[in-house]
Amino acid sequence: VAIMSDMLNEEKIRNLVIKHYNSITCENEMKPEIILGDVPVFSVDTEGSICLDENGDPVLTLDFSKADKIMDFIKKHNEKNPDDTIRVRGHVLVWHSQTPDWFFREKYDSQGAYVGKEKMLKRLENYIQKVLEHYDGVNSPYRGIIYAWDVVNEQIEPDDFHPEKNPGSVRYTCN
């Protein structure tokens, strides 16, 4: 079942999920649009300077709070019910439709030029690594709860033969 973090505010829904499902998917909470946010937030060092990655890009701060609310609920349930656990299908690491436009642009500026293929591939790799580390890294409190990830959502569509129609898309950038 797909659930949203706000749905967990209702006891009836929590009980329904526990009673009838052994697998859930976050509706939107694990999508780049939610984790990255509407505007980029950059990591800063102890002196207040923006941290830069190996490409010279500012290091993004990711917001896992909405998905973590769901993961905390599942983790707590699983700890209390080891013979009746619920697992999570991670959805989704890459999706052109629900990724903020600024993620594809120079300096993460929505007015900047689109980055080239190599830079975009590196950004995607860094983003995916951070998400996977958060949810299944050695020190993650959620390690082992996610059993599968949808890596790329809706990659193939009729407009794939005309990527110039959507120059900001992952498809166009990576061609």
Residue ranges and their predicted role:
Residues 19-175:
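Substrate-binding cleft and catalytic face of glycoside hydrolase catalytic domains
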